[in-house]
Curated annotation (Swiss-Prot):
PANTHER family: F27J15.22, OLEOSIN. The lineage of its organism: Eukaryota, Viridiplantae, Streptophyta, Embryophyta, Tracheophyta. A motif (Proline-knot) lies at residues 55-66. The modification N-acetylalanine is found at residue 2. This is Oleosin. It comes from Pinus elliottii. The chain crosses the membrane at residues 22-42, 56-76, 77-97.
Amino acid sequence: MADQYHGVMQKIHDHTPNPTQILGFITLFVSGAILLLLTGLTLTGTVIGLVVLTPVLIFFSPILIPVATVLFVAVAGFLSAGGFGLAALSAISWLYNYIKGRHPPGADQIDYARMRIADTASHVKDYAREYGGYLQSKIQDAAPGA
């Protein structure tokens, strides 16, 4: 009977958590309790704020909504103007560097596109010249005295 008792006690002792695990569990429990308390306080404050401020917001909404709309449009306009100004300044700076030959990023693509356009225009001009000569000979064949 004593052996059984010692065997059971040994199993219980083997499965008990060590002090580090106990300290970790206590820390976890305390942190969870604090976060739960803060969540409750936040929710309570939000509900109280809504209960107090909702009648005020409804009463002043004919004034607040147009003011908020005007402020939103004004801020959006200023931010857009600043963004467009920055984009224009960047484009002018890039163009200045390109004209001065400082080789800004993307200049190779611009040069390649310019050469392709010039090459295509040259091919179109040659084709038009050939086709124009062909039409001229057809006109002379159709009306020899013309």
